[in-house]
Design a protein with these regions (language model features):
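Short hydrophobic/aromatic beta-strand immediately N-terminal to the Walker A/P-loop
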Residues: 342-345, 451, 551-553
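Accessory, non-ATPase domains that flank or precede helicase/AAA+ motor cores in DNA-metabolism machines
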Residues: 1-308
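Pre-Walker A segment
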Residues: 273-348, 354, 360
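Conserved helicase motor core of P-loop NTPases
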Residues: 456-618, 629
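Loop/turn positions that initiate beta-strands
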Residues: 51-53, 594, 623
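Conserved helicase motor core of SF1/SF2 NTP-dependent helicases
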Residues: 358, 362-368, 374-386, 395-403, ...
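C-terminal accessory regions
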Residues: 503, 611-614, 622-740
Length: 740
């Protein structure tokens, strides 16, 4: 049956729960429909249990592996009323501490009144042999907790608010959640809960809230600022904030202006003139930006007057490394000797790594304890391999963890407990957002040196800000621009094409070479077929490159040539089903032993084990790539090996993982791969840009194969569209900020 655009309702009783994620409520269940049929239902239905009745609203869909399913958008649930239904409900372990045996005793004693006794008169349960008062209270508390969750879901469902929002609300506020959201539905828009303003607004207006209330306008204002922060902006202009909030909420600009004033007074919002713009910040982003600028300015003004003989030291380092430095690299050494903070930017093959190695050797001569760092695990690993020194992610360096309320990140290293080093060399700086740069600077002692290295022409950070570009454009921080392509890289078509594309030139894609090939495929399905062939047979057989050394990149997650569809194809080709190979389904994804997977959110608490079983540390970070080594249905765990260290995930944690044979260009930043297959086709206009193509090409070390339409490639080269990022760091460094 084809999906219908009109919502469909199915009424029935839960026959079995196949899968349930306790964190996000995603559920797969069998529903005995009232018409006598049985169907598989998927969706966010927290705490679903066999025996309960529900009305699910949604549409039919066909899963490529599991066939026809009903995708539920909402579920209206009713508590069982008859003794038989109550027994089925409790025997299905709906309430922690109650199984089939206890359920039978309860229903035999209290019949259809069992649930009322559980919730309101738990002391009566002690009349049953084996149930103590403490056990009765525990069972009652568990039932009330679930009942409270159900009431919250039902209350929010009145405004068609997603069940996952109810789940987050209850996890965060507990038994107070329903009362809090009834008092102020706009609490749902907070970062911790993550509802859209439209969801909270529908609930509030539906329950009699004034459409011009101060709470409503404040929520809309903060939502607009948070929405823009997700899109990379540190601030937006006052005028744009008034217009956007007015459009979102439907209230006059004057009321929004009053709300801004109130939020400024409360400290939740900061209004300041930035480079001639009347800007409005979320307080946390303003603090991060202001501190970063203040600290960098202080460091930039610190010059070392007692200069060593850099010419002599450079010659000594050249002999040590077996290299001859170009003049630009000697300049990096001179600046690193003279200044507390410097920036180095350059494209592929221009000697950034050589400059890092040279400065590292220089700091050794100066007897400075130097720490190497990068934004991602893959970038840190590459930095270690190229320098022969240990490098860490910024998060691991700063000993990241969760805050006391478990809703935000916290760093153990800060002003009160700074890093015990004399210098930090930070690579891949274009990936660092304003909050992370602020955290690093807070953790550095006042005298600690900082070397910032990166390629300012690559994509900016995913998080707010344009830190590396702002630092370089300010002209305040001593900067070296590496432009000379060295002999080893000069013969590479990958390097030549990258620089040509960065200049806006159209290379001859038909002119294939030893390390670059273009395969023209204008049909998306044929392009996808070609990608699979390259990874499965052509590169392993013809060029002796194993699939483990091949990374497929694409600008987008969607469409036939996007990340999601290609990962399904490559899993089937490179790691198919086999006897003895265990699997675990999670939503629409099947995880299988042997799969290549990526961590997609920071997990600061997960434990890493060495092969001998000893603890290697804690924390797996967004972008880390590993391989599934074991799936254990008995313990409901899945193990992933990351560079020889194994992390074990409970099945409820699998929303932290996704397949990684294919990744988006954005996710590939900071990494380098022996062979890259870049598939370009249909994508959103802001993904088909020169910076995306340039970033993708510069990920390839030895071989680059582009599959797709040359028209799309040339369009990307010509498309310099960059969504302007409202970031005030450059203006602060240049002294262009003041009161609004």
């Amino acid at each position: 049956m084809d999906a219908n655009t009109n919502p469909i309702e199915l009424c029935g009783t839960v026959a079995a729960v196949i899968y349930q994620n306790e964190e996000n409520g995603y559920t797969v269940l069998k529903l005995d429909v009232d018409d006598g049929s049985q169907t598989m239902v998927v969706g966010c239905i927290p705490y679903a249990v066999p025996g309960e009745s529900m009305i699910v609203t949604g549409s039919w869909m066909t899963h490529p592996a599991h066939g026809q399913q009903f995708k539920a958008e909402f579920a209206e649930r009713t508590m069982p009323e008859t003794a038989d239904a109550i027994y089925a409900y409790l025997a299905g372990r709906a309430v922690r501490g109650i199984g089939p045996a206890t359920a039978s005793l309860l229903v035999s004693r209290f019949g259809s009144d069992t649930l009322n006794v559980l919730e309101y008169e738990p002391e009566k349960l002690t009349a049953i042999k084996g149930i103590s008062l403490s056990k009765a209270k525990a069972m009652s508390a568990n039932f009330r907790r679930q009942a409270g969750m159900r009431r919250l879901i039902e209350f929010l469902a009145s405004a068609n608010i997603r069940p996952v929002i109810a789940l987050r609300m209850y996890q965060y506020y507990g038994d107070e959640a329903l009362q809090l959201v009834q008092d102020n539905p706009y609490i749902l828009v907070s970062d911790a809960i993550g509802a859209t303003f439209q969801e909270a607004d529908a609930l509030a207006l539906g329950h009699g809230f004034d459409d011009q209330s101060a709470e409503r306008v404040a929520a809309a204002t903060l939502y607009e600022l948070a929405y823009n922060a997700i899109r990379g902006h540190c601030f937006i202009s006052y005028r744009n904030l008034l217009a956007a909030t007015s459009q979102l909420s439907g209230v006059p600009d004057e009321l929004v202006a009053q709300s801004v004033d109130t939020l400024v007074e409360s400290g939740e919002l900061v209004r300041e003139r930035v480079a001639g713009c009347d800007g409005c910040y979320l307080a946390r982003l303003h603090e991060a930006e202001a501190y970063t600028a203040e600290r960098l300015l202080a460091m930039a003004q610190n010059e070392y007057r007692r200069m060593p003989n850099t010419e002599r030291i450079a010659a000594q380092i050249e002999a040590q490394l077996g290299l001859t430095f170009a003049e630009q690299q000697k300049e990096t050494l001179r600046l690193a000797c003279q200044h507390q903070v410097i920036a180095i930017t350059g494209g592929p093959g221009t000697g950034k790594t050589t400059s890092i190695r040279a400065i590292l050797a220089l700091f050794d001569v100066l007897k400075l304890d130097t720490q190497l760092a990068a934004p991602t695990g893959r970038a840190a690993k590459r930095m270690s391999e190229l320098t022969g020194r240990s490098a860490q992610t910024i998060h691991r360096l700063l000993e990241a963890g969760m805050s006391d309320d478990h809703q935000d990140i916290a760093f153990r290293r800060d002003e009160d407990d700074p890093l015990e080093c004399d210098a930090v060399i930070l690579d891949e700086c274009s990936m660092v957002d304003i909050s992370l740069m602020c955290a690093l600077l807070r953790a550095m002692r006042p005298e600690c040196r900082l070397i910032l290295v990166g390629d300012a022409d690559q994509l900016p950070s995913v998080g707010p800000g344009n830190v590396f570009s702002d630092i370089i454009r300010s002209g305040v921080i001593p900067t070296v621009r590496l432009t000379e392509i060295f002999r080893q890289a000069a013969g590479s078509s990958i390097v030549a094409y990258a620089h040509a594309i960065n200049r806006g030139e159209h290379p001859n894609l038909a002119q294939n070479s030893g390390d670059f090939f273009f395969l023209r495929r204008t049909d998306p399905q044929k392009a996808a077929d070609t990608v699979v062939e390259l990874c499965k047979t052509r590169l392993p057989n013809n060029m002796k490159i194993p699939p483990s050394d091949i990374q497929v990149l694409t600008p987008t997650r969607k469409y036939d040539t996007g990340m999601a569809a290609l990962n399904v194809r490559l899993q089937a080709a490179l790691n198919p089903q086999a006897d003895g190979k265990k699997e675990r389904r999670f939503g629409e994804i099947i995880f299988r032993e042997g799969d290549r997977v990526m961590q997609i959110r920071n997990d600061y608490d997960i434990v890493l084990k060495n092969p001998d079983g000893t603890t290697a540390g804690t924390g797996v970070y967004n972008g880390d790539v590993g391989q599934i080594t074991a799936i254990d249905p008995q313990t409901e765990t899945l193990s992933v090996c990351y560079d020889g260290k194994t992390a074990t995930y409970g099945f409820e944690m699998l929303n932290e993982l996704e397949h990684a044979w294919v990744m988006t260009v954005h996710k590939s930043q900071g990494s380098e791969y022996r062979a890259v297959v870049l598939c370009i086709g249909r994508a959103g206009p802001m993904l088909l840009t020169r910076s995306v193509l340039y970033t993708a090409i510069t990920r390839a070390k030895s071989l680059l194969i582009v599959v797709g339409d040359e028209g799309v490639a040339y369009h990307m080269i010509d498309n310099q569209a960059q969504t302007r990022r409202y970031s005030g760091l450059r203006a602060r460094l240049c002294g262009e900020c003041g009161e609004a």
